[in-house]
Amino acid sequence: MGKFPGISTTIAFRAATGALRAGALALLINAGAEAQELNQALNETILTITKEGIVFSAKLETTIFKPTGSGPFPVAVINHGKSPGDVRYQGRYRPLMAARYFLQRGYVVVVPMRQGFSNSTGNYIDAGCNIESNGREQAEDVRAVLDYVTAQAYADRNKIVVLGQSHGGWTTLAFGTFNYPGVRGLVNFAGGLRHDSCGPWTANLVNASRSYGAKTVVPSLWFYGDNDSYFGPTTFRLMHAAYTSGGANARLVAFGKLGRDAHLMFSSLAGREIWQPEVSAFLRQLGLPHEVTQPQYANPSSVPVPPRTDFAPLYALDSVPYVREKGRAGYAAFLATDFPRAFALAPNGAWASASGDTDPQKRALDRCNKDGQGACKLYAVDDAVVWAN
């Protein structure tokens, strides 16, 4: 994952050609060239899937997490967001918490990097201020990937759910207008596209939502929070009202405030308590697998997350107790890492951090206690200070 909220990460920043026909051919990428180690326990692999065009083609970097066995498995597609700046510097998206959720329920999880992002070839198609067109262009990449996946013996082409966060949520809603065979439902986590330089961007977003809803027949589930740094309550409620105005079936889960920025809910430890029960109920309504049948893919933390405290603001480096200059620099580096994450410290100045899929609270404490004489405690988890003086 990258380091901006458009792709479910840590620090909140504000983000300021013709139709292609989808054909697909998959080739394994040399895993040795990947900076991120593949998770063998989750059967993680990386493919390139060729999106054929009339003139040009693009090769789409796609991550697959697959249950052990031959299938066929229901399919969950998870669409990434967009960082500000050059999208080629955006790292491969690995929503491990969500991947584990679906693997436990027997799904194969498909995570495509769209055209121009990360190691995918081609150029990101911006479409200027036309937010509706932007979403559809992104959705063409999702179509190409699904055309490949549904041709594989391991995939159940009649049981598909498509999800996305931020720009990926917007891509998911746009993809819904294709009414792709076998897709049962859509899940939108804080979806949208914000173009502050395009005048009335909110009106553009609302009008595009209305257009998407008028063309979509499958149900959708929407998640938005009140303190979302991109799409506040007025905006997301207008979007939802417009989307459903023509009869589209979309249920809005407005979960209020969460942490420093509700835009990050999908990837946060606290957020899973919001979205996972709702998504399970949604899958049940769609007639899709929703109960845990493969618990070996779970990743329970052995260290519970303490409650948020009012000890200090998250980004107040000078308020972090005990640590010296090197420790403050380490805390600053921690703030630039992805969720889930944890930072621990001890009265003797020892400190450590950990981030990523495998129990960051325990790893941070274990590392800290190597020098902390067993006195280390958690200072921050995700975007919450949990230190009690």
Q: Where in the sequence are the language-model features?
A:
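Alpha/beta-hydrolase fold nucleophile elbow
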Residues: 154-165
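Alpha/beta-hydrolase active-site loop
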Residues: 130-152
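Secreted/extracellular ectodomain signature
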Residues: 117, 165, 256, 290-389
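Cap/lid segment of the alpha/beta-hydrolase catalytic domain
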Residues: 83-95, 101, 111-137
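C-terminal catalytic histidine-bearing segment of alpha/beta-hydrolase fold enzymes
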Residues: 246-304
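The feature captures the conserved acid-bearing segment of alpha/beta-hydrolase catalytic domains
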Residues: 185, 191-246, 251
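Short beta-strand element of the alpha/beta-hydrolase
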Residues: 72-81
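N-terminal cap/lid segment of alpha/beta-hydrolase-fold proteins
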Residues: 36-70
